[in-house]
């Protein structure tokens, strides 16, 4: 069924040509011409088939072959001829001097065809493509997805910058607050007694606060939190401590570790620094009942060498002299102020009326 390919013969060489083979082919054609390509290999002493010799000469060894890039005029000629002739590369090559059909075909597949597709032109019919309108929603969705991915990458980078900014603002606020506290009360105490937190400790504190807020609220943003705290500094744990009237830590330790009888008197200058928020309010029912229940009796005080630091003095003093000494106070303000610090010899004469209330005694029992 037709002629068999010449390359099927046994012993013929295939693959790239060597410079020696190229020189043999050039010398033979220059002397004798190519003649019959099927008989040329034996005459030129080449172990190749006739087709391989023809393609090698036509596409590479021919002296009139034009090398280099295609010009704009050659591109327009190829496009015009392809719209008329189609993929007939040999016919197109006859209109381009020095260009081979194989070179024109490669240039079409690698450059011109892709260029037409990008311009929205069908490379076969050379007409505008109509299938673009059918795939337009998919193209728009892909474009939107690309923009979304870019925005997500930008947002992730901004989150790292926002976290660093939050750390810096938090540390700056804490250090400024400590400096202002030192300037206002520099004569009474040192800042190390109030705030002994180094930078490493502060960073750990900030990280713990941010992680806790993220667990409670996934939408937590430390930058927005800091902006809100600028309007209300009470949200900062450190700001709450600084805004309140404070006393030195040595004085707080003195008040907490000593028994009520060892507390300084009302005129002691150490009490001037005690914040009012640390004093036990008299109108607190929970503290009042707990103190009545938990306070030991006088008999227990005789055997207790180390009374608890949080125990308040007895509401009703069993010593008649003490009760009698408290009766001359006619001013309720004086009585309440004398009982604010819980001195045993300064009990208020209002307390017995409260203690003998029947409903209150039922609760205590």
From Swiss-Prot:
Domain of life assignment: Eukaryota
Residue ranges for the DNA-binding region feature of this UniProt entry: 37-61, 89-112
MF terms (GO), sorted A to Z: DNA-binding transcription factor activity; transcription cis-regulatory region binding
Source species of the chain: Arabidopsis thaliana
One of the Pfam families matching this protein, by short name: Myb_DNA-binding
Chief location: nucleus
Localisation: Nucleus; Cytoplasm
Keyword set includes Membrane: no
Gene3D superfamilies found in the cross-reference section: Homeodomain-like (1.10.10.60)
Subunit architecture: Interacts with FBX5.
Upper taxonomic lineage: Eukaryota, Viridiplantae, Streptophyta, Embryophyta, Tracheophyta
Residue ranges annotated for the HTH myb-type domain, each copy included: 9-61, 62-116
Protein's UniProt name: Transcription factor MYB93
